[in-house]
């Protein structure tokens, strides 16, 4: 068992959370790492055992236009402060992973500055893709070049160049030696060179035990990236889409089909599960019925994978993209505004309870997933391990529903594990002749522990 197999991640976008300037003016945000450490402690309090923080390193604007891979963004603080942050997380038992933006760099990156200054004679011209000295761009460089997503702000690196590969490998060694990080989330992994990622995996196996590589992949066969030769995991965007649209459309078949399909492709690989992140709108802005936030939180924690929370989502905050800007998805928040949320906010309460259950019940991590009942509006499945079972029951309909299914293990009673959460509703269960009946209120979900 590796640490990431039973991890619960808390995702922090630090430039947003700390209220940093959107364009890098070189000025530190007072108390940034003190604030980040307080949020990491909060994450531990609700059961998160790992912190994914990023982008973190010196950039010109949003963090993904890297200027210096080995210098913490001056808007946040210093290398020493980040080193202390990691040490404090480790003291709490939390692992720390950072963003690795290896596909592209910002225009102020040293090698691109050399290309601008020296053109055909540039020492580093082969570090970049599709350089054309007969072309031009909106910056009037007098040449054109490959980029990410059509944005010339993000200059594409040539990952097949051994010098570029070794530069990135040395950067990772620096991050481990200097900061003692535990893994990397690879930005834009779906356009990274596969041989480069194989090299990353070999390096990961050498530099630190259980060093974790997780890639940002949107579409496709995830097993092409997540496999024993390349990455340990990838972002499960396919399930992310199903989580909100399956509830909006009252269609649990979409979620169940997605999980079956991914199990067929990826087998026991644990994909990174999320309901929202720094690139997509928050659940309250996507769901037609916000009561379904509870359902989605339960699914993220109980389906096969690695659950995560994006900062602020445990409070049910909103976040909607504006034209040309993702900053509304990455807000500055103050913990003091939510100091009693676990006792008053239904969303916070259920996330905190799920964190405790994940730590207490091994079947939620290691148990086989057994589908028990599936309709468009009702879904029941179990996590079964060594004769123990938790049963997840969900109703996305506007009317109460009765579920009935075969017991996955022998049992005589069932305990509602989320009965004490804020906003919990009473449910009725009955067991007879190896079958179980559950009466669920409308738009409600919970987890039942089967008892002998």
What label would you give each PLM region?
Residues 8-11, 51-53, 96-98, 184, ...:
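Hydrophobic faces of well-ordered beta-strands that scaffold small-molecule active sites
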Residues 1-9, 13-49, 56-178, 200-206, ...:
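Substrate-binding/active-site clefts of carbohydrate-active enzymes
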Residues 90-92, 116, 177, 187-267, ...:
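Active-site-proximal helices and loops of the catalytic beta/alpha 8
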Residues 48, 180-181, 305-306:
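A structural motif
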Residues 430-452:
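C-terminal beta-strand-rich structural cap/linker in extracellular carbohydrate-active enzymes
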Residues 104, 168-194, 273, 277:
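Active-site groove signature of glycoside hydrolases
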Residues 2-6, 24, 28, 255-412, ...:
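Loop/helix patches that line or flank the sugar-binding groove of alpha-linked glycan CAZymes
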